[in-house]
UniProtKB/Swiss-Prot annotation:
Predominant location category: membrane
Higher taxonomy: Eukaryota, Metazoa, Ecdysozoa, Arthropoda, Hexapoda
Expressed in which tissues: Expressed in many larval tissues at a low level, moderate levels of expression are seen in testis and head and highest expression in muscle.
PANTHER family, sorted: FACILITATED TREHALOSE TRANSPORTER TRET1-1-RELATED, PTHR48021
Cytoplasmic side: 1-46, 113-124, 171-175, 223-286, 345-350, 412-419, 473-505
Name listed for the protein in its UniProt record: Facilitated trehalose transporter Tret1
SUPFAM superfamilies per record: MFS general substrate transporter
UniProt function note: High-capacity facilitative transporter for trehalose. Does not transport maltose, sucrose or lactose. Mediates the bidirectional transfer of trehalose. Responsible for the transport of trehalose synthesized in the fat body and the incorporation of trehalose into other tissues that require a carbon source, thereby regulating trehalose levels in the hemolymph.
Single Gene Ontology BP annotation: trehalose transport
Length: 505
């Protein structure tokens, strides 16, 4: 499937980019030039095209994640035709990827700190391709397992690295919108898997997946390492060059450079082992918020729905074809994240999480009722449309809130001192939850039936809503330094900025 995104369409697809890329802003006179002389008050234009390129490059890479997640649903329908594979082994085709992603999440933290964000991300392109080629050429289930493990490790690494890279390169005013692009393109990968999988068998679908890392690798060559990583390695001039590339040659970057340096100095001053400090009083709030969001993201059951969408429709006895239903869900998943990009910097993170929770709770309860009636031999033929309607609204709700926002906030709320280690912990925890949900999904259905499983997910969603209300801060419009200062100073919440700053550096 050929994807062409022209400059104008790209600008129009991201809220505020058109406005911010043309509006004039005044620079402050209180910041000094490198030679110590004060800046003159001048009119400059914000330069966002390079930030768009950086976000777009990472987002294309996120298609690998989505394709890996969406592969199972169409593949298992044809895999048992040409492979000698049992029902239990099929569950491992779905379960091995998140389990391996757990390992990737653990090793990804040290990698992004040692090698840098960019090199770590680019380094996954070749293994991704190797993993897909193993699956495509598999003559037994062991080769499929090996390919899924390799792809899974890469998924875990980039799941951690993408939000950190976005958080450290994009300006606060558009970080919400651009920060959701990786999730949007991840959903594109899921949609591609569903669409292409309706025409290709499991082997040829894997060949298709092997081609996705190529454009991602080429685009990442054009982008810089993050300024924050350079500063953490005392490579100040390279940090300045990177920031200049991201913000534009004629934009005042001195305040941002100064904030980066001060933040790093404070991190260096606190000293100590980053892992030991994860659960210190200073950093515990940010870590627990991140872990909580990851927990509720996965225990809503979304990956079980994505991995086994076709099977769920077969069980429902719905009049809607299971392959068509899977494609419709993929389309909704794809479109809804772009809706979120238009809303997140207007409504904020918390409002979208509220909407997300309510939508999922309502639809899971309704779909559970449908399966309960069917289980008790009550005729539900007249409601054959209900499973698709519920799952569409469920996926829509998830994709505008609990889908992208935990990953976005991973790059926002974790303090620089522990960012790599904490992101590694949160990512590993996320994929642990994903593995548990996907691997035990069929077992839970066997134990408490489909209606009980869906109602269990609904109760967990209620817990997620309460968690957001009482513990999750609003980060809209905040710089990373402001968020870190609030969360590490003992403040329970990060207050929302209702008015954007007049001066942007």
């Amino acid at each position: 499937m050929e994807m062409e995104i022209k400059d104008e369409n790209l600008r129009n697809s991201v809220p505020f980019v058109r406005q911010l890329s043309t509006d004039s802003v005044k620079t402050k006179t209180e910041y000094d030039n490198e030679d110590g002389t004060p800046y003159k008050s001048t009119t400059q234009k914000l330069f966002l095209w390079t930030q768009l390129l950086a976000a777009f490059a990472v987002s294309v890479g996120s298609m690998n994640v989505g394709f890996s997640s969406g592969y199972t649903s169409p593949a298992v329908l044809t895999m048992n035709i040409t492979l000698d594979i049992t029902k239990e082994e099929i569950t491992w085709v779905g379960g091995l990827m998140p389990l391996a992603a757990l390992v990737g999440g653990i090793v990804g933290g040290p990698l992004i700190e040692y090698l840098g964000r960019k090199k770590t991300i680019m380094g996954t392109a070749v293994p991704f391709t190797i993993g897909w080629m193993l699956i495509a050429n598999a003559i037994n289930v062991v080769m499929v397992f090996a390919g899924r493990v390799i792809c899974g490790v890469c998924v875990g690494i980039v799941s951690l690295a993408f939000p950190v890279y976005i958080g450290e390169t994009i300006q606060p005013e558009v970080r919400g919108a651009l920060g959701l692009l990786p999730t949007a393109f991840g959903n594109t990968g899921i949609l591609l898997a569903f669409l292409v999988g309706s025409y290709l068998d499991w082997s040829n679908l894997a060949f298709f997946g092997a081609a996705i890392p190529v454009p991602f690798f080429l685009l990442m060559i054009l982008t810089p390492e993050t300024p924050r990583w350079y500063v953490s390695k005392a490579r100040v001039q390279e940090a300045r060059k990177s920031l200049r590339w991201l913000r534009g040659k004629n934009v005042n970057i001195e305040k941002e450079m100064r904030d980066l340096t001060i933040s790093q100095t404070e991190s260096d001053r606190t000293g100590g082992n980053a892992f030991k400090q994860l659960f210190s009083k200073r950093y515990l709030p940010a870590v627990m918020i991140s872990l909580g969001l990851m927990l509720f993201q996965q225990l809503t059951g979304i990956n079980a729905v994505i991995f086994y969408a076709a099977s769920i429709f077969q069980m429902s006895g719905s009049s809607v074809d299971e392959n068509l239903a899977s494609i419709i869900i993929g389309v909704v998943n794809f479109i809804s994240t772009f809706i979120a990009t238009m809303l997140i910097d207007r409504l904020g993170r918390k409002v979208l999480l509220y909407i997300s929770s309510v939508a999922m709770i309502t639809t899971l309860l309704a779909l559970g009722a449908y399966f309960y009636l069917k289980q008790n031999h009550i005729d539900v033929t007249a409601y054959g449309w209900l499973p698709l309607a519920c799952l569409v609204i469920y996926v829509l709700g998830f994709s505008i809130g609990f889908g992208p926002i935990p990953w976005l906030m991973l790059g926002e709320i974790l303090p620089s001192k522990i960012r790599g280690t904490a992101a590694s912990l949160a990512t590993g925890f996320n994929w642990t939850c994903t593995f548990i949900v996907t691997k035990t999904f069929q077992n839970i259905i066997d134990a408490i039936y489909m209606h009980g499983t869906l109602w269990l997910f609904a109760v967990i969603c209620i817990g997620g809503l309460l968690f957001v209300i009482f513990f999750v801060p609003e980060t809209k419009g905040k710089s990373l330094e402001e968020i870190e200062m609030k969360l590490t100073s003992g403040s329970r919440r990060v207050r929302n900025i209702s008015k954007q700053p007049e001066n942007i550096c």
